[in-house]
Design a protein with these regions (language model features):
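C-terminal non-catalytic regions of proteins with extracellular/luminal or membrane-system context
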Residues: 2-197
Length: 197
């Protein structure tokens, strides 16, 4: 339905784009990812726009649709780097699961897919797809729809920034201690204060 599609595009955050998105129809695409079922659905949706190839070496661009930064995902990035192919990372995640600095730095573009319509009443139906639909993802990759989401939490880009983030304030990652303490004092006095970004 239209509302669900709108929610999917409005909850997708374009974290990075090194002038690769939107993709072009003449580009050959290799699709890989965490789930073979998701990859199969993505291939079918992307094939409406471009040629999907079965080998990374034959591709102009790689679409990596993953749910975690695990060994398989890191190996995919290494293989793409060896083949000198740009990666568009489509990362299904949320507050507790986000792309790390390695993933972002290894990608030419990053779409952070935060949409999840999992039932919250303790049960779910088998084979019920509850993430961003492959057709909506393909539309965003090819510029038919625009991702317009924003994060409601911070993401540290370096491990040093992550260590410096105290976790209780937004927008304090990487700021100096004096500014961070000032921000904490402002929020303590007025919890609804707008902090500079």
């Amino acid at each position: 339905n239209a509302m669900e599609i709108q929610l999917q595009t409005e909850s997708t955050v374009l974290l990075k784009n090194d002038n690769i998105l939107p993709l072009k129809a003449e580009q050959k695409v290799y699709v890989a990812g965490t789930s073979k079922d998701t990859v199969a659905m993505d291939k079918e949706a992307i094939a409406a726009y471009a040629t999907v190839v079965d080998n990374m070496e034959d591709a102009d661009v790689i679409i990596a649709h993953v749910t975690a930064m695990d060994d398989a995902t890191e190996l995919l990035f290494e293989d793409a780097a060896d083949a000198e192919k740009p990666v568009v990372l489509c990362y299904d995640g949320g507050v507790s699961n986000e792309p790390d600095a390695y993933a972002v730095n290894s990608s030419a573009a990053v779409l952070f897919l935060t949409y999840d319509c999992t039932p919250d009443h303790g049960s779910s139906m088998g084979n019920f797809y509850h993430k961003t639909l492959p057709s909506v993802l393909a539309d965003m990759l090819y510029g038919v729809k625009a991702p317009s989401g924003k994060t409601v939490f911070e993401m540290a880009w370096t491990s040093e920034d992550a260590e410096l983030d105290w976790g209780e304030l937004q927008f304090d990652t990487g700021v100096d201690t004096k500014t961070r303490l000032y921000m904490a004092a402002v929020v303590r006095n007025n919890p609804t204060a707008d902090l500079p970004t």
